[in-house]
């Protein structure tokens, strides 16, 4: 079976690796173009999928768009049986969707129709969802609206971070995709339409959302911290030894206590929220590495959280 793989971030890599490992012929990998990196933006960083594909000698394509006839002709010339799409980052026009003999299949990190869109892992945690999952669906022209081929649910534990959920779903996605490809080869892959009720959208995380609002209930603050960990990272300003610094918050737990929002309630970083309190468990100063609260506080006195 001739496969075109389309993906960009680290999340996509285990699925690409599994497809290669199970003997499928990956004739091309499509990924986002290299991005400027370094302090001056003079270096170009290739995506994790780009790096992995080159390790296996797979031709890599990095178009900025797939809307043009020339790019669509190149894609069609690959004569793919199927395209596998996992966090690619570009919308696929109808000409691309129709080109593979068996269609295009997407690995999506939510229980559709909940959390269609760009940031399903973060949004599920930020909303306080108790479960999510990984789904394989056949793509159509809508945004994550196609019929579902396979799904597996995953519990979201109370302190689970987006990074931990990301890693879990990536592994599950690799297993599901291999099972789906096998069923597709055997012509036994059953498709079920998505429910019409319960549709929500997982908008891309806005930078403004990363700043913690201590006037919100503790549950919401805790969900924001873990939902944005490790990237982009929730943050706040702290008065440390009399100077105000910006600090990233990577882990927290729900606690007990009350006070004006942002009040430091004890010497172990219990912080009052609009309702209840959270204990900050892992913090990261600018230019530093994440530290457990006990180590972060060594020789430091936090008097105010803004």
Swiss-Prot record:
Task: Enumerate the residues binding (6S)-5,6,7,8-tetrahydrofolate.
Answer: 110-113
Kindly name one Pfam family recorded for this protein.
Formyl_trans_N
Give the protein's function: Attaches a formyl group to the free amino group of methionyl-tRNA(fMet). The formyl group appears to play a dual role in the initiator identity of N-formylmethionyl-tRNA by promoting its recognition by IF2 and preventing the misappropriation of this tRNA by the elongation apparatus.
Gene Ontology cellular component annotations, sorted alphabetically: cytosol
What family is it from? Belongs to the Fmt family.
Catalysed reaction equations from the record: L-methionyl-tRNA(fMet) + (6R)-10-formyltetrahydrofolate = N-formyl-L-methionyl-tRNA(fMet) + (6S)-5,6,7,8-tetrahydrofolate + H(+)
Q: Which InterPro entries match?
A: Fmt, Formyl_trans_C, Formyl_trans_C_sf, Formyl_transf_N, Formyl_transf_N_sf, Formyl_transferase-like_C_sf, GART_AS, Met-tRNA-FMT_C
What EC number is given for this enzyme? Answer: 2.1.2.9
Keywords tagged on the record: Protein biosynthesis, Transferase
Q: Which EC class heads this enzyme's classification?
A: transferase
Protein name in UniProt: Methionyl-tRNA formyltransferase
Gene3D superfamilies associated with the record: Formyl transferase, C-terminal domain, Formyl transferase, N-terminal domain
Q: Which gene encodes it?
A: fmt
Q: What's a Gene Ontology MF term here?
A: methionyl-tRNA formyltransferase activity
Q: In the UniProt record, does the keyword Cytoplasm occur?
A: no
């Amino acid at each position: 079976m001739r496969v075109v793989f389309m993906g960009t971030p680290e999340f996509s890599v285990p699925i690409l690796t599994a497809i290669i490992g199970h003997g499928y012929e990956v004739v091309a990998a499509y990924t986002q173009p290299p991005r400027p990196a370094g302090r001056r933006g003079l270096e170009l960083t290739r995506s994790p999928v780009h790096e992995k594909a080159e390790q296996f000698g797979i031709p890599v394509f990095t178009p900025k768009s797939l809307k043009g006839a020339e790019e669509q002709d190149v894609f069609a010339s690959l004569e793919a049986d199927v395209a596998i799409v996992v966090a690619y980052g570009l919308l696929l026009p109808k000409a691309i969707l129709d080109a593979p003999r068996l269609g295009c299949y997407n690995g999506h990190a939510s229980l559709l129709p909940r959390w269609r869109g760009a940031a399903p892992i973060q949004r599920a945690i930020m909303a306080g969802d108790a479960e999510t999952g990984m789904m394989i669906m056949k793509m159509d022209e809508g945004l994550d609206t196609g019929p579902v081929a396979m799904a597996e649910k995953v519990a979201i534990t109370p302190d689970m971070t987006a990074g931990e959920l990301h890693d879990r779903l990536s592994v599950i996605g690799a297993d599901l995709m291999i099972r789906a490809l096998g069923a597709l080869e055997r012509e036994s892959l059953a498709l079920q339409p998505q429910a019409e009720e319960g549709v929500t959208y997982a908008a891309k995380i806005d930078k403004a959302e990363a700043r913690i609002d201590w006037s919100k209930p503790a549950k919401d603050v805790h969900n924001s911290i873990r939902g944005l960990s490790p990237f982009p990272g929730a943050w706040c300003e702290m008065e440390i030894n009399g100077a105000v610094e910006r600090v990233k918050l990577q882990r927290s737990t729900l606690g007990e206590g009350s006070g004006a929002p942002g009040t430091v309630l004890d010497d172990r970083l219990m912080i009052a929220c609009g309702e209840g309190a959270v204990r900050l468990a892992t913090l990261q100063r600018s230019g530093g590495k994440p530290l457990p609260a006990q180590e972060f506080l060594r020789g430091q006195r936090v008097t105010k959280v803004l």
